[in-house]
């Protein structure tokens, strides 16, 4: 099993190319089930979750071809992937596939919309709290679907003639459920109005792609989205937006290690809140012609309190990385997690490196220390795993991160990108 070895102490200087967003690519790929034409996606990252979803879509009858190019040694792959689903050959998404990745559950929306039925296993993915599927079920029921849970599967069927547009208010904001409702409502009869919809850039990206396919959608990026159903969707060509979580992660890595790095192919508007928070911590961030420049030279890291919130608030997917940064701040900071109820699993691993963190419910208190010391640590989920890498960049000696398959789910060749900027990071196999 692979591990990541980090030898701390080096600053980061250079250019890091930002990949396409995993959290945008997955729903875009699933949208290929909505049309019998070809959907072409550019800037698709090469990640374990993407490859798993390719297998799942193939199970449903999607023909997939990949074109990749590598412009120079070490540069991230820029992949163009073509998805063609002439006929859906199977409306069942089996446990052995869906259990490995939560987002694969989202196929339930397009399958219902196009075929009128779906049998989908309850999902897997990161072990972050309960993450129930109630919001998905209730949203699709509002469109007329009949839903039944049986033996770990959801059996869903649309009314005769297809799903029916409706006005629905989510009881809480959910990115995944908003994705599913967008896709399902695009082929529903009549008009659907979604209130309390997620406003994340990935939702907007999906809406833009669906519109290019012929959907009629207004309001994406606001809390109210209106979808006028159409009888069919066509193919389209769409570029996956830059990964804002990867952008924020590398910005925090530079903040931790110090240095001067250009994050290429991204933009500040995707994560204004997180970047403003880093500025408060003492990091200089500016726009460039190709992306963002992140600089921290000499000045110490200032403590900053954060509360995770849906977009445009501070992203929960950057909480662990920011906690790692705060372990070296010149004071005490507090992090309140409001999105997931069990997203502090990285705390005990950061403590193994010398971090001083105490928990009280959904709040963490971080007392900055002057030094961290390398140790063997274990990744518990995707974002927690990269927080350990960030901490390892400044820890004295060697930090060995195990269970890095979590990293491979969401970060495209992380060790290579960091190494190109001067970090001592390598993947080792037992």
From Swiss-Prot:
Q: Tell me which EC number(s) this protein carries.
A: 2.5.1.7
Q: Which residues does phosphoenolpyruvate bind? A: 22-23
Q: Which cysteines are joined by disulfide bonds?
A: none
Task: Report the CDD domains cross-referenced here.
Answer: UdpNAET
Pathway as given in its UniProt record: Cell wall biogenesis; peptidoglycan biosynthesis
Extract one GO cellular component term from the record.
Answer: cytoplasm
User: What's its top-level EC category?
Assistant: transferase
Q: In the UniProt record, does the keyword Zinc occur?
A: no
Give compartment(s). Answer: Cytoplasm
What is the official name of this protein in its record? UDP-N-acetylglucosamine 1-carboxyvinyltransferase
Please name the taxonomic classification of the source: Bacteria, Pseudomonadati, Pseudomonadota, Alphaproteobacteria, Hyphomicrobiales
Q: Which gene encodes it?
A: murA
């Amino acid at each position: 099993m692979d591990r990541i070895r980090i030898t701390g102490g080096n600053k980061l200087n250079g250019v890091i190319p930002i990949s396409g967003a995993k959290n945008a690519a997955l729903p875009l790929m699933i949208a290929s089930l909505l049309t019998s034409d070809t959907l072409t996606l550019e800037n698709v990252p090469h990640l374990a979750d993407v490859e798993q979803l390719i297998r799942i879509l193939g199970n449903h009858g999607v023909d997939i071809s990949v074109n990749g190019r590598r412009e120079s040694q070490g540069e991230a792959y820029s992949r163009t992937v073509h998805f063609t689903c002439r006929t859906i050959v199977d409306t069942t998404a089996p446990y052995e596939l869906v259990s490995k990745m939560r987002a694969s559950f989202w196929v339930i929306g397009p399958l219902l919309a196009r075929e009128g039925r779906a049998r989908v296993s309850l999902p897997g993915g990161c072990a972050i709290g309960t993450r129930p599927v109630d919001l998905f079920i209730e949203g699709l029921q509002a469109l007329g679907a009949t839903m039944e849970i049986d033996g770990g599967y959801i059996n869903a069927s649309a009314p005769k003639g297809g799903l029916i547009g409706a006005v629905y208010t989510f009881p809480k904001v959910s990115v995944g459920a908003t994705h599913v409702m967008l896709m399902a409502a695009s082929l529903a009869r009549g008009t659907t109005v979604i209130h309390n919809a997620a406003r994340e850039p990935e939702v907007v990206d999906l809406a833009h792609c669906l519109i290019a396919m012929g959907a009629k959608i207004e309001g994406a990026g606001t809390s109210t989205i209106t979808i006028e159903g159409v009888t069919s969707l066509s193919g389209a060509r769409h570029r996956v937006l830059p990964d804002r979580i990867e952008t924020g992660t590398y910005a925090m890595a530079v903040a931790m290690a110090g240095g001067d790095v250009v994050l290429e192919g991204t933009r500040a508007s995707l994560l204004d809140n997180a970047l403003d928070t880093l500025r408060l911590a003492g990091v200089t961030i500016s726009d460039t012609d190709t992306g963002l420049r992140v600089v921290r030279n000499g000045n110490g890291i200032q403590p900053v309190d954060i509360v995770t919130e849906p977009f445009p608030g501070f992203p929960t997917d950057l909480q662990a990385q920011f906690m790692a940064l705060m372990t070296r701040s010149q004071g005490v900071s507090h992090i309140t997690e409001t999105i997931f109820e069990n997203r502090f699993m990285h705390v005990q691993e950061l403590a193994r490196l010398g971090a001083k963190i105490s928990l009280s419910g959904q709040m963490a208190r971080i007392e900055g220390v002057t030094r961290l010391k390398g140790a063997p640590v274990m990744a518990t989920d995707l974002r927690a795993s990269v927080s350990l890498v960030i901490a390892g960049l400044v820890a004295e000696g060697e930090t060995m991160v195990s269970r890095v398959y979590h990293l491979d789910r969401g970060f495209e060749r992380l060790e290579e990108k960091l190494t190109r900027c001067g970090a001592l990071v390598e993947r080792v196999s037992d």
